[in-house]
Amino acid sequence: MKKYIVFLILTGLFGFGLMGQNEKVGKELMKVIKTRASVRQFADKPIEVEKVSHMLLDAAMAAPTAMNKQPWEFIVITDSEIMEKMGKEFKNASALSTAKLAIIVCGNMKEAIEGESREFWVQDCSAATENLLLMAHSMGLGAVWCGIYPSKERTELLQKFLNLPENIVPLNIIPIGVPADNVAPKEKF
């Protein structure tokens, strides 16, 4: 009986310790979620492109997907001339002109679910995009989701611009860099 009581006490203390840790992590995560904002102007400050893009892509690919299909492709662009041309071509992505990095999140239709559930690729790639945006913010970087799909005109234009095969469908362009200013999140509640 004494061993059982000691076990319950230890279990309770251990559980309380975990609850405290989980609560702390939860509060930190909620802070990142609530303070993230769309950043459209970037400072002329360098970033460690390889390290940053690796971390952002790791976060993106940790997203859940329907049937674990992972129907995504990520195109990383670091060439400022290409980003500037894209920013002029895609007015909703003018933030590319000052970004140090851009990631284009695409759906790979060869990896997507077949049949009536095919469009789940949009949700899968959207979840990956949100993970990427939150990770960028947690690293002190700014980013903005510039929509491409479902606009047929934008989708076809970007496919042509990047010479993408027909099965790769761009969902969005995400310009990334050090924010030029402190951007406050919009009131949403």
Regions found by a protein language model. Give the residues of each.
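Sec-dependent N-terminal signal peptides
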Residues: 4-14
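Sec/Tat signal peptide C-region and signal peptidase I cleavage site
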Residues: 16-20
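N-terminal amphipathic, basic helical "cap/leader" segment at the start of enzyme domains
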Residues: 21-101, 107
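Small-aliphatic-rich amphipathic alpha-helix that forms the alpha element of a beta-alpha
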Residues: 55-61, 103, 116-158
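A short coil-to-beta-strand element that immediately follows conserved catalytic motifs
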Residues: 70, 141-145, 169
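A glycine-rich helix N-cap at a beta->alpha junction
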Residues: 94-99, 159-186
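Acidic, glycine-rich active-site loops and adjacent beta-strand->loop/helix elements
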Residues: 107-110, 148-152, 180
